[in-house]
């Protein structure tokens, strides 16, 4: 049931209850009218739990229910059942209004002004330039991309940020391996994307370090040369980073992931030191005898965290900074550049402690004044035999996973589509639908094991199933269009009397509420569940009714408009979940 109908009924009951209170000399501050969905559709469309109202008025719920029924019985079919008031609304008006609304608003159906231009930054992806994106990045990226679309749909002004980690020890590992084993190889010569080539050298370094005790010192020496801006070292660093970033951007393009601003860590990492030095001047930090600049953090080892502290070094005694310090600088930069109200970091659960410390220090230094900082922690994506480790080469690369799924799909596509390019494009879209839906349908905080077979199912809770239902509805609409039946001047939606039609209309009308809930909870899985429910209901409906009946063009016209509304709702959900819509499958 859509929000406007719920609000209307809620307002009407509020007036009745307020008048009842006045007539009984009862003072009311606030009335909590709890609207619920009945457990069974035959009970009604809306249920009101009367306990809270009875408690507020200090009157028997039977008396309150009787008063509400007396005042609303001309508008609704309403019945008291125990502690509930069950209400059935006018189907004719509701069906007509819902279908007209969806088919008029089209792509904007389900949007709202819930967050009303709130300025929100979403930081996600943040890859290292020493390896290609893996399936863990795919989860991070689709969460970030989907949430950005969901938050925009409820009225927020979104800035999507990607901080690429292009410096440090981990980057030097690939550089050292390339110096030793590269022999002038390039992505073109290797017939590889640049990020994959760099990833190969990251794995080579790991093997090299296991056999050479001096490897760690070589890395530190190389890092020192980089910091001293040694010409040949900087040239190598720029060349390898360019290859890696070009490859990573190709993957973003394939997966329909985009950013409003991309930062390179090498360009901004020093800003955090200035922020800390300002904090030192203001007395928020202190300097140790060895010259290190520190701040005291609440200890996580005791329940009374505010009574005990632990020392956190922000700038080391040698003048170098830690990642937390660099992130403080990032907050300062983004405040100046975007003047945001809220910043959401989409980062894996292994970084929970880092963000606890970051947010505490940011507050102490006054960086987060009038701002909300959120760490949206997501679980890991594992291999069947455990956690991925890229330094060992035991990892599902994002590109390889997509290619692998395409290979599984392409034989079926080539049977249906003669044009090879079209078949490959369709296979890619199905692969993306499979991956994105699978990575979004679980609770964000949970670790998951990616199951290729399950992700590609055309019958279960999967992306390809949602895509198939969308394509199926489109084919029905195309079939109807080909019949060249004259356009009806007025559609009689009162003809839609099948119980499944009513159930589907109620689901369609709840899109806005589901989008708002997904935005509130920062949880795209609310929309995967919603999409799956709508798709399943349509499939059952289509098995039970004949949509196109040339002997009954009035009913057919009503059902065609009904299907248009279903398809539009599914398409809007697919966009929010970054799942490609397909005309044919």
Curated annotation (Swiss-Prot):
Could you cite one Gene Ontology molecular function of this protein?
Answer: ATP binding
Q: Name the enzyme group at the top EC level.
A: ligase
Looking at the keywords, is Kinase present? no
Q: Which GO terms describe its biological process?
A: arginyl-tRNA aminoacylation
Pfam families named in the record: Arg_tRNA_synt_N, DALR_1, tRNA-synt_1d
Q: Which reaction does it catalyse?
A: tRNA(Arg) + L-arginine + ATP = L-arginyl-tRNA(Arg) + AMP + diphosphate
Where is it located?
Cytoplasm
One cellular component (GO) term of this entry: cytosol
Question: SUPFAM superfamilies of this UniProt entry?
Answer: Anticodon-binding domain of a subclass of class I aminoacyl-tRNA synthetases (SSF47323), Arginyl-tRNA synthetase (ArgRS), N-terminal 'additional' domain (SSF55190), Nucleotidylyl transferase (SSF52374)
Residue ranges for motif 'HIGH' region? 127-137
Task: Identify the HAMAP family for this entry.
Answer: Arg_tRNA_synth
Tell me the PANTHER family matching this sequence: ARGININE--TRNA LIGASE, CYTOPLASMIC, ARGINYL-TRNA SYNTHETASE
- Complexes and interactors: Monomer.
Q: What is this protein called?
A: Arginine--tRNA ligase
């Amino acid at each position: 049931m859509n929000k406007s109908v719920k609000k209307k009924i809620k307002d009407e009951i509020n007036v009745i209850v307020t008048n009842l209170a006045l007539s009984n000399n009862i003072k009311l501050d606030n009335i909590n009218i709890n609207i619920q969905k009945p457990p069974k559709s035959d009970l009604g469309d809306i249920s009101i739990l009367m306990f809270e109202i009875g408690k507020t008025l200090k009157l028997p719920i039977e008396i309150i229910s009787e008063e509400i029924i007396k005042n609303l019985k001309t508008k609704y079919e309403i019945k008291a059942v125990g502690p509930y008031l069950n209400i059935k609304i006018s189907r004719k008006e509701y069906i007509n209004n819902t279908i007209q609304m969806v088919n008029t608003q089209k792509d904007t159906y389900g949007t709202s002004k819930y967050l009303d231009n709130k300025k929100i930054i979403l930081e996600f992806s943040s890859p290292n330039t020493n390896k290609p994106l893996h399936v863990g990045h795919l989860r991070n990226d689709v969460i970030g991309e989907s949430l950005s679309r969901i938050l925009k749909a409820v009225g927020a002004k979104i800035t999507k940020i990607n901080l690429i980690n292009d410096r440090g020890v981990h980057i030097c590992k690939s550089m050292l391996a390339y110096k030793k084993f590269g022999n002038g190889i390039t992505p073109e010569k290797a017939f590889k994307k640049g990020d994959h080539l760099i990833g190969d050298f990251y794995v080579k370094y790991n093997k090299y370090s296991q056999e050479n005790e001096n490897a760690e010192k070589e890395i530190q020496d190389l890092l020192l040369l980089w910091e001293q801006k040694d010409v040949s070292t900087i040239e190598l660093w720029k060349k390898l980073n360019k290859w890696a970033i070009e490859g990573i951007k190709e993957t973003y393009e394939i997966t329909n992931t985009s950013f409003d601003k991309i930062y390179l860590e090498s360009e901004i990492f020093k800003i955090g030191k200035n922020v800390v030095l300002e904090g030192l001047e203001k007395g928020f930090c202190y300097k140790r005898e060895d010259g290190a600049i520190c701040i005291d953090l609440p200890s996580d080892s005791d329940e009374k965290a505010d009574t005990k502290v632990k020392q956190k070094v922000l700038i080391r005694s040698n003048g170098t900074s830690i990642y937390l310090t660099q992130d403080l600088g990032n907050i300062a930069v983004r405040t100046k550049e975007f003047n945001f109200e809220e910043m959401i970091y989409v980062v894996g659960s292994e970084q929970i402690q880092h963000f606890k410390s970051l947010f505490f220090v940011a507050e102490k230094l006054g960086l987060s004044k009038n701002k909300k900082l959120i760490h949206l922690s997501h679980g890991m994506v594992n291999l069947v035999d455990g956690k991925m480790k890229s330094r060992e080469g035991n990892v599902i690369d994002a590109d390889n996973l997509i290619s692998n799924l395409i290979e599984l799909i392409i034989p079926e596509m080539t049977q249906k589509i003669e044009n090879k390019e079209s078949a490959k494009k369709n296979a890619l879209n199905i692969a993306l639908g499979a991956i994105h839906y699978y990575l979004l349908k679980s609770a964000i905080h949970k670790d998951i094991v990616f199951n290729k077979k399950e992700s590609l199912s055309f019958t279960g809770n999967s992306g390809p199933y949602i895509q198939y239902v969308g394509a199926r509805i489109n084919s029905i609409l195309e079939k109807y269009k080909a019949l060249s039946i004259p356009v009806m001047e007025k559609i009689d939606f009162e003809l839609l009397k099948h119980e499944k039609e009513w159930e589907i209309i109620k689901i369609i009308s709840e899109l806005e509420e589901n989008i708002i809930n997904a935005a509130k909870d920062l949880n795209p899985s609310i929309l995967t569940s919603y999409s799956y429910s709508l798709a399943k209901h349509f499939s059952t409906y289509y098995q039970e009714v004949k949509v196109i009946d040339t002997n009954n063009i009035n009913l057919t016209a009503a059902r065609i408009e009904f299907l248009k509304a279903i398809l539009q709702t599914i398409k809007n959900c697919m966009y929010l979940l970054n799942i490609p819509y397909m005309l044919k499958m």
